[in-house]
Each structure stands twice: as structure tokens, then as C-alpha cells.
Amino acid sequence: MEVKVFRVKGTFERLGKKQPFTKEYRALKEEHVRELVYSDIGSKHRVPRTKIWIESIEEIKPEEAEDPVVRRLSLEL
């Protein structure tokens, strides 16, 4: 199995305001990324899953990653 890099875009609602977000993750499947987003944003911002809206999940090349940690981990392999 190959670990892929995904970019996730969406919004979440906190205190009545919508906040856009863009995150990058390394995972095996798109379903794993979806769970990581819900877990990460939910725990950091205390937002329930029903207030997190994922607009897109796209697979990107490791070189295109903007997050330096994701890029470095992906390119070291």
C-alpha cells in the first residue's frame, strides 16, 4: 500500500461564524482523511461533526504540499 497526500478544503461553524480551512494529510484512503479532518478540527476547535463541512478532498503530488511537515515526510521516502 502506498501513502498518498491529500488536500482538504471546507468550512466549520464556531460561535455562529463560519471559518474556512485548508489542510493537508498523508493517508492511505480518502475515507481515512475524512475521519482525520473531523477528529482534528473537532478536537482543536471544539466543533461537533455536524458543524464541519468538507467541500473537497483531492489527491496531490508530494511536491505540491504546502505544509512543510507533510512535504518533508512524503519526500523522504
UniProtKB/Swiss-Prot annotation:
Keywords: Ribonucleoprotein, Ribosomal protein, RNA-binding, rRNA-binding. The keyword Cytoplasm does not apply. GO terms for cellular component: ribonucleoprotein complex; ribosome. GO terms for molecular function: large ribosomal subunit rRNA binding; structural constituent of ribosome. One of its GO terms (biological process) is translation. InterPro entries: Ribosomal_eL20, Ribosomal_eL20_dom. Belongs to the eukaryotic ribosomal protein eL20 family. Part of the 50S ribosomal subunit. Binds 23S rRNA. NCBIfam families: PRK00773.1-1 (NF001981). This is Large ribosomal subunit protein eL20. It comes from Thermococcus kodakarensis (strain ATCC BAA-918 / JCM 12380 / KOD1).
